[in-house]
Amino acid sequence: GDYTVKAAVTPVAGSMSELSRSISVSDTEAAMVVSNDFPACREEVVFSLNRMTGVTGVSWDFGDGSERRQTASASETLTHSYAEEGRYTVRAEVAYADGGTETLMRQIEAAGLSLSWACRNFDPSKMWIMAHRGNTKNGYELPPNSMAAFRRCVELGCVEFIETDVQITKDGEVICLHDNYLSRFTDYNDYASGKGMVADFTLEELGRFRLKTTDGKVSDQKIPTLEEVLMEFRGKVWFNLDKCMESDVSIEKVYDVVERCGCLDRVQFYISDDTDRADWLSRQKPQGIIAPHANKEEVLTRMAAYSPVYMIQTSTQYAGASWISSINARALSVTNLLDDEGQAFYNGNTTVMDGFVSAGVRMIQCDYPAEMDEYLRGRGKR
């Protein structure tokens, strides 16, 4: 780019003066620019070159057997998606005005399925399952929001989404923990009294604590970082990141981690009805997938106007046929079967869940995903 450097000069005697100089900076070597080196299948990946002068054309080979494509300059972009999982070598043959040529190469690894593509192609006769806090047995066997719990969800093979919660440490790291304090879900009170606010501890300091199960048993599990979670599970399951609307959670920091892990098309940011954060996510390049909450028509209309929005959550008591139909007209409806109603379902009372199925709910968040999968299979919803 072009820059103007200014220097304010103050002499020993006399008045201050300002000097300025214009500088132009350009790349001296061509390099391939890719929006995501680790995309999901069907994700739209953007390819281009850096701002290299003297480029007269580029021939692109995406390494998957698709037809070569051409661009006329370094600044021109191309979008490509991969249909199947695998590792691909992308080649860009660059032609220069002086007659020279150069071949650039980049490795791309595609895994899992694009969340946006899957939502746009959702089968309305089916229902997805989201594991609340990564629970499989309501957090009694494995602690909520633990790596062990998330692994169990993936092993089950019936969980499309894991819901987890994000918090920010004293040194700005993003971790996965339901509360913004430590006493309920860790063994913090074995060391100190009080609640222990997450924001008062660095990531290193949090490393001494261990997560607890729902009934308070201390496990061997540490509090995971969001980066650890996404790097291990990208391409295996999608994530719903709760708490992105909270004032003590930096949406910018959460977004940065998701982007760095190549998961912007594998994750949605739950922001409830926070229009400021919805607007911020929609303005990013690439955009973050917005996951709103709406219990009223005016909120639904307002939040559905943002993009990209593929799913809209509603509270259990509002999830009747008429309201679910209104949500489904704009996005995919999501509701919860948790707490007493979730326990009743586990004990064999399917009345509430029967109503959700009849209403046309598209995804159910629950603490018993294996049992939910069995129930939904019996109703032809899987």
Model-found features: residue ranges?
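Phosphate-group recognition and catalysis centered on beta-loop-alpha active-site segments
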Residues: 26-30, 108-382
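Extracellular/lumenal mature domains of secreted and surface-exposed proteins
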Residues: 1-127
